[in-house]
Curated annotation (Swiss-Prot):
Pfam families: IGPS. Its EC number is 4.1.1.48. GO terms for molecular function: indole-3-glycerol-phosphate synthase activity; phosphoribosylanthranilate isomerase activity. It is an enzyme of class 4 (lyase). Keywords: Amino-acid biosynthesis, Aromatic amino acid biosynthesis, Decarboxylase, Lyase, Tryptophan biosynthesis. PANTHER family: INDOLE-3-GLYCEROL-PHOSPHATE SYNTHASE, TRYPTOPHAN BIOSYNTHESIS PROTEIN. This is Indole-3-glycerol phosphate synthase. GO terms for biological process: L-tryptophan biosynthetic process. PROSITE patterns: IGPS. SUPFAM superfamilies: Ribulose-phoshate binding barrel (SSF51366).
């Protein structure tokens, strides 16, 4: 699935005027492309509001990161659970009206979550780096910054906000981008979870090497429907390379029950990332305990 990083007719600003030359393919072709185009614009604005040197100065005052990958490996629950803090999504709209990130994080930790994932996209998921920073202040387990990372600047934003790991989505990044962003993240002490959606993407990431934590998203990027057997199909096609590189597999999306969790574990997932199914529960702690079993 090809994702264009920018519109074919980017807007040009001259003095107080902003315009774009008409183009027949000027609209995003899918929701992911729409998000990527908007993210590119957001990052440009963020750079002006808070220049990179100021972010770096903030990072230098922080304590060391927690080892996200090792924490998953050492989890007392099997598979390990990455519980997600997510208020809304493009496909589901508002997921949790009573959205109190701090309370949610505490409930997840009490429920037995191995790590947490925090959505930092504001436009489409109603998250933010402020949400991540607030959670970091009260939680001591590792945190994943979940966003649509396109630029190095965003990695510094994540680290400055208290992240221990970042998400890189293979579908929106070139090989060169993946390697470069990986290098920057590692230099900041961050773990990297690379997300793939099919066997072609997984093969591509495995050929690059150096990515010991990979997530298989069970959600179809075109229809946004979920199918848990995606984890099985994708992992099976690349089983030899996965074993050779000692990759820890994470199954993402579409996990609602204990049976779902056990199913993806049987497919080879050592960890699961669960968001919507938990976010819709009134009692998050008990819901997570029941899911873990």
């Amino acid at each position: 699935m090809e994702i264009r990083r920018r519109p074919p007719n980017p807007k040009v600003k001259v003095a107080n005027l902003e315009y774009a030359i008409p183009h027949e393919e000027s609209e995003p072709r899918n929701i992911l492309e729409k998000i990527v185009w908007e993210k590119d614009r957001e990052v440009e604005l963020a750079r002006h509001r808070l220049p990179l040197p100021k972010l770096i100065a903030k990072i230098e005052k922080l304590s060391d990161t927690k080892n996200f990958l090792q924490t998953l490996k050492d989890s007392v629950t099997s598979p390990a659970v990455i519980a997600e803090i997510k208020k809304a999504s493009p496909s589901r709209g508002l997921i949790r009206e009573d959205f109190k990130p701090g309370d949610i994080a505490i409930a997840y930790q009490k429920g037995g979550a191995t790590c947490l994932s925090v959505l930092t996209d504001k436009t489409f998921f109603q998250g933010g780096f402020d949400v991540l920073a607030d959670v970091r202040k009260i939680i001591d387990i590792p945190l994943l910054c979940k966003d649509f990372i396109l630029h190095p600047y965003q990695i510094y934003q994540a680290r400055a906000s208290g992240a221990d790991a970042i998400l890189l989505i293979a579908a929106i990044l070139s090989d060169q981008d993946l390697m470069y962003l990986n290098k920057i993240a590692l230099s900041l002490g961050l773990s990297i979870l690379v997300e793939v959606h099919d066997a072609a993407e997984l093969n591509r990431v495995l050929r690059l090497g150096g990515f010991p934590l990979i997530g298989i998203n069970n959600r179809d990027l075109k229809t946004f429907e979920t199918d848990l057997t995606t984890t099985c199909k994708v992992a099976t096609e690349c089983s030899n390379l996965l074993k050779e590189q000692d990759v820890l597999l994470v199954s993402e999306s579409g996990i609602f029950t204990r049976e779902d969790l056990q199913k993806v574990a049987s497919f080879g997932a050592s960890a699961v990332l669960i968001g919507e199914s938990l976010m819709r529960q009134k009692d998050l702690t008990n819901a997570l305990k029941e899911l873990i079993g």
